[in-house]
């Protein structure tokens, strides 16, 4: 595995975007399936992508999913989907039919089941599991990723792509992981 080190979050975002675009350029007939998480680094990346790479990105060959979501409406500033919608998707005119949000206002257990079904129906499967081309994760200061916090490692062995992760941070910050 290769490792890359960049001098800033901005440089990292540029490098990642350029890598993703190059990956898509190598297979011009392929549809690519992406799963994104939230947080400060993806927000920076979304803003840069919309403002500096809009014209060179093959948006119509991308299908957008989420790794996790908070149980809040899309309009809430803490919504991962809402953040990406405002910073990137609306800016580049991404058609709704290529965007598959987790609905944070639904009951977490029901939405985790519904989203698992949706992902398994719309993303190519490998060994019975969704085979995304890219899953972009971050890591919180407390060591969490994909809404899986220390002590919740049991979620990694779920038979479903998405499960509910109740956190210790805030009562509304709950759903889901890939």
Task: Specify the residue positions occupied by each region the protein language model found.
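A glycine- and small-aliphatic-rich helix-loop capping segment at beta-alpha/alpha-beta transitions
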Residues: 48-58, 82, 86, 150-159
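N-terminal glycine-/serine-/threonine-rich phosphate-binding loop
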Residues: 1-33
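Short glycine/serine/threonine-rich phosphate/pyrophosphate-binding segments
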Residues: 43-45, 144-147
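Short, well-ordered amphipathic alpha-helices
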Residues: 20-21, 44-53, 85-86, 116-120
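Glycine-rich beta-strand-to-loop/alpha-helix junction loops that act as flexible
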Residues: 36-41, 137-141
């Amino acid at each position: 595995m290769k490792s890359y080190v960049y001098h800033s979050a901005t440089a990292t975002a540029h490098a990642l975007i350029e890598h993703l675009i190059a990956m898509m350029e190598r297979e011009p007939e392929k549809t690519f399936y992406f799963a994104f998480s939230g947080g400060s680094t993806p927000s920076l990346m979304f803003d840069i992508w919309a403002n500096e790479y809009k014209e060179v990105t093959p948006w119509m060959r991308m299908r957008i999913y989420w790794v996790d979501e908070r149980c809040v409406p899309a309009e809430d500033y803490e919504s991962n989907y809402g953040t990406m919608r405002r910073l990137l998707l609306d800016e580049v005119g991404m058609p709704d039919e290529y965007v598959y949000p987790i609905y944070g206002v639904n009951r977490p257990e029901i939405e985790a089941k519904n989203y698992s079904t949706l992902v398994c129906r719309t993303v190519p499967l490998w060994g019975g599991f969704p085979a995304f081309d890219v899953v972009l994760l971050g890591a919180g200061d407390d060591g969490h990723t994909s809404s899986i916090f220390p002590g919740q490692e049991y979620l990694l062995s779920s038979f479903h792509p998405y499960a509910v992760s109740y956190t210790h941070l805030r009562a509304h910050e709950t759903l889901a992981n890939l």
